[in-house]
Amino acid sequence: MNIHEYQGKGILKQFGVAVPKGIVAFSAEEAKQAAEQLFEEQSSPVVVVKAQIHAGGRGKAGGVKLAKSPEEVFEIAQKMLGATLVTHQTGPEGKEVRRLLIEEGMNIDKEFYLGITLDRTTSSNVLMVSTEGGMEIEKVAEETPEKLLKIHVDPVYGLQGFQARKAAFFLGLQGEQFRNGVKFIEALYNAYTTIDASLAEINPLVITKEGRVLALDAKINFDDNALYRHSDFHDLRDITEEDPLEYEASKSNLNYVRLDGNVGCMVNGAGLAMGTMDLIQLSGGRPANFLDVGGGASSKTVEEGFKIILGDKNVKAILVNIFGGIVRCDRVAGGIIEAAKNIGLKVPVIVRLEGTNATEAQKMLDESGLNLISAKGLRDAAEKVQKALATA
């Protein structure tokens, strides 16, 4: 689960992570009032107006502006709220700006990168620091890897003092800045583990000319599998930032990711789902989604899956590819037939079922009298997808 920058900073602040003073605003008038308050409390001649969307690259897209007065903040907020911000992470459709973060201005001396995430290869957390603050860390790792330090942290023992100091040394911090940097890194790691985050990213981490170490931007992602331990975090979810179909799928516990293709797919198992997407591509189509219904696919699960797939108007055909190991193919076939009757399928559905009771399942589909096309293997399924698209 993703959250907004201001929400992430609010959580980090509770763990002693230093963040700038900031106030969230949902209207231009609220933004002006927030600016008035900040100008009274700060010595900086400017405040920062930051669009709050679930995407990076806001600065380059015009989503971060400096203002020298509350009146200027009001004007910026009027233009920014309700506007669509297009960044390299939003796609061409962009995201609508519905809230702003008004933040105190900083007298910045240096900018760095600091991030913590899970490294599945080593089964450990990895602390990453770079002298290239404000840059995309993937680009830094590819083009200037010598400017990036990775420190693997054993999740059992946690972050050790020498590791935090090593990271601060790498950034070239000295004296009071060094001590503040170590304290910041330790506080961030504590927050990351306590809240069960999958990512805690500070980009940039800034050193002010007064020696303060602050998170100028913060990105926090939660591990969805651990959200049951943090019931208070559910209120932080902003469904307006999510794809409507992906949100509906999450309510039915379906693993669904929307893509930009024309062939919907319903599969049990992530590996088979990825293979099916390749099959669709090789057949001349483009996958419209990733949908894993899991090992215990039921009639209700299948019906919900069809509803979500058909919610995408670009879908011209559907490929159902099920391997019946735990789940029985005849049960899945029954679910497909029932769903087809209830929903009223108007696009061709190609169904490939292999495994337990596959023969019975094929017979059920053939005798259903519905627009269900059974396939007897991957090659046959590919050919029938191709044919369905040609007549769509």
UniProtKB/Swiss-Prot annotation:
GO terms for cellular component: cytosol; succinate-CoA ligase complex. Pfam families: ATP-grasp_2, Ligase_CoA. It comes from Chlorobaculum tepidum (strain ATCC 49652 / DSM 12025 / NBRC 103806 / TLS). ATP binds at residues 50, 57-59, 103, 106, 111. Its cofactor is Mg(2+). GO terms for biological process: succinyl-CoA metabolic process; tricarboxylic acid cycle. Residues 9-248 form the ATP-grasp domain. This is Succinate--CoA ligase [ADP-forming] subunit beta. Heterotetramer of two alpha and two beta subunits. SUPFAM superfamilies: Glutathione synthetase ATP-binding domain-like, Succinyl-CoA synthetase domains. Belongs to the succinate/malate CoA ligase beta subunit family. Substrate binds at residues 268, 325-327.
